């Protein structure tokens, strides 16, 4: 999905990426409903269930009582650390911030803006897939209408969290 969005935005020169991503949301949601017949899919492997329900015992830390961390929390923390390092300590990460700040200036400085945008949208699709696997493992089902009508909640959370509509700044958290 992310690759599709990235290519669509760069090749079709969409005036605003929000239009493309919202449009593909409905396309892929409809496709999911067609494939599943509108019914939840269940019977996932133990590995997928482990992503949603698994726990890591912290007794090896010398705690008197057995305490646990959810596998999903550990996975998300690892992904956050990797992406923080990627954004703050790699050339591509710096380019992402530059493109968010001013794509024309980034293009003028020699950055292949379209290539980086496709990479960014592909990474977003990958991260959405990780989130979907965790949710499927947690509920032991792939519900085709999961997240229905939560688009506004997601946008509001980003705004309240301090995301800039104008780009050029931001953090993994």
Predicted feature locations:
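Alpha-helical transmembrane segments within multi-pass membrane transporters and channels
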Residues: 1-25
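Hydrophobic positions within alpha-helical transmembrane segments of bacterial inner-membrane proteins
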Residues: 3, 7, 81, 125-133, ...
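Membrane-interface helix caps of multi-pass small-molecule transporters
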Residues: 3-12, 34, 85, 89, ...
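Membrane-helix interface "capping/anchor" motifs
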Residues: 10-14, 91, 165-173
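Transmembrane helix-bundle core of multi-pass membrane transporters
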Residues: 17-95, 116-119, 139-144
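Start (N-cap) of specific transmembrane helices in multi-pass transporter permeases
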Residues: 113-125
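Transmembrane alpha-helical segments in multi-pass inner-membrane proteins
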Residues: 122, 128, 138-173
């Amino acid at each position: 999905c992310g690759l599709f969005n990235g290519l669509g935005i760069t090749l079709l020169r969409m005036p605003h990426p929000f239009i493309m991503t919202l449009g593909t949301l409905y396309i892929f949601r409809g496709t999911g409903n067609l494939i599943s017949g509108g019914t939840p899919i269940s019977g996932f492997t133990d590995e997928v269930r482990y992503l949603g329900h698994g726990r890591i015992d912290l007794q090896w830390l010398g705690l008197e009582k057995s305490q646990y961390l959810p596998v999903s929390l550990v996975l998300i923390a690892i992904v956050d650390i990797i992406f923080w390092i990627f954004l703050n300590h790699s050339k591509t990460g710096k380019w992402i911030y530059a493109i968010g700040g001013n794509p024309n200036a980034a293009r003028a400085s020699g950055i292949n803006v379209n290539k980086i945008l496709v990479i960014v949208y592909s990474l977003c699709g990958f991260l959405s897939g990780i989130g979907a696997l965790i949710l499927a493992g947690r509920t032991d089902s792939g519900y085709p209408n999961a997240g229905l009508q939560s688009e506004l909640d997601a946008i509001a959370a980003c705004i309240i969290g301090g995301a800039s509509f104008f780009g050029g700044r931001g953090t993994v958290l």
